[in-house]
Amino acid sequence: MSLRVGLDLDGSLESLGNSMTDLADALDRTGECELVRFRSRTSASADNETHLALRALWSPLWRRSLGRSINGLLPRVDVVHVAGLATPPTREIPLIVSVDDLRPLRGETHTHLRITQLRRAVERGATLVASSRSASHEVISVLGVARSRVVVVPPAVPRVDETRDGADLVVNITGVDELFIALAPQLIAFAEDHGSRVVALASTSAGQKIRSNGLAITTRARRDARDALANARVVIHLSDGARFPSFAIAALSAGVPTLARATEINRELLEGAAALVTDDGQVRDTLEEVWSNGSRRSIMVAAGRSRAVDFAPDTAARAYIALYREVVRGWTA
């Protein structure tokens, strides 16, 4: 009997596209499961998506891991996989929850609701999926759950086209607005010296800070990430390490040499493919090398493309098929 999987398409955090849709399409290509696509927070938008009756009523409760069981609103499925804010209860089948954003589990952005929600889901038998080993350690520590309840499967990174003849210095800012403001003058000077410009991919609040500081920087919304990458000569991924570095990996896939901070997750996932800096004072010198050294760039492009294959949608789909089967076997044993 074919494995039937309920997949929530509303869980993507990506600026490059919907990673859950990419995962769904890749799962379909395997031919190893039957997908029931649904949306937990928004209305169904395609013919192949299942409409959830009274979704607007249940959705606020699902954010607390309460309310009606999701499989009561779906055709028969063997397992349900969600990755966003909703963790709906299930009845007599397992739930898999991808935890791709660690900000609600951390210090100043610590969100009691999210922590309670995830703990409640685990108490009911849910399996949590972290995007990296370092992220799994943080999830286990903060939630206080058993190591056996957390597994590691990287998310699908949306496909991007190869970048040719890019000229911009593109900086992706995630959770480190003040650091970027501090680095901005030297990045602007570098770009001017090399006949380029700085393009910052930023949240609305970060964009406002950049403009209020009068910085000569082109700011673009996250939804423009794909277009920005298409014109990049070098990408700098500035992150607090709370989320999977999908933009950096997409840059590697596109053949754009990439520089990133040596956070724990970046060392785990990007070392050997991107240039990692351990001190923010190293950024200018490292950037010069990555920008101007032809042989270094060629090596980085080859290594980056090789690494990006590990996070392609088809790779993620194979890993998730194995996880679905393992979780269903454990549930029915």
PLM region spans:
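Carbohydrate transferase catalytic cores enriched for Leloir-type hexosyltransferases
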Residues: 1-333
